[in-house]
């Protein structure tokens, strides 16, 4: 039984392998390859060739928008969309200080806390509204590989978004 499953898996991978490569399109061996469906705002995989400098950005949380709001409420940081924009702007600044940009992001991990206004469910749509302003756009078409997960909480009450990224930059 296990041999049959392994044989089927191998056949499937061999059959789908060329399709995945075709989606990535031709790329020079020394260029980053972003693989995935063209209509998707995220890459299924990103291949970074040897020789690139990697920048690892720790989990970044949103800035306080309203210091007069009651402590521990989302109004301290805004809704999920607002928090996502604030976090990505912070990441953008960190990357720019290192000579990189959001176009260099190859991997992203998004942690979302459930929104009390949504019955404790993560606001994936709100996060995507913020995300789509920066990635897979006409001005910045590069898409990172990404994971989005709901977590129980972050470091401060009212925070609903934390994002960690890895960026790859070709040395001069």
Question: For each predicted feature, which ranges?
Answer:
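N-terminal presequence-like segments and the immediate start of the first folded domain
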Residues: 8-89, 93-109, 115-172
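N-terminal secretory signal peptides that target proteins for export/translocation
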Residues: 1-7
């Amino acid at each position: 039984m296990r041999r049959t499953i392994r044989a089927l898996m191998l056949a499937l991978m061999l059959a789908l392998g060329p399709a995945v490569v075709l989606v990535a399109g031709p790329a020079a061996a020394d260029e980053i390859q972003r693989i995935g469906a063209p209509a998707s705002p995220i890459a299924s995989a990103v291949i970074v060739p040897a020789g690139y400098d990697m920048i690892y950005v720790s989990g970044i949380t949103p800035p306080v928008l309203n210091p007069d709001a009651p402590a521990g409420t989302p109004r301290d940081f805004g809704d999920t969309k607002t928090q996502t924009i604030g976090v990505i702007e912070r990441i953008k600044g960190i990357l720019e200080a290192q000579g990189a940009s959001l176009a260099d992001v190859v991997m992203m991990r998004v942690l979302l806390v459930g929104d009390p206004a949504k019955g404790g469910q993560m606001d994936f749509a709100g996060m995507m509204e913020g995300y789509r302003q920066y990635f897979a756009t006409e001005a910045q078409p590069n898409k990172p590989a990404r994971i989005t997960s709901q977590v129980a909480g972050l470091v401060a009450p009212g925070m609903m978004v934390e994002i960690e990224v890895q960026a790859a930059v070709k040395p001069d």
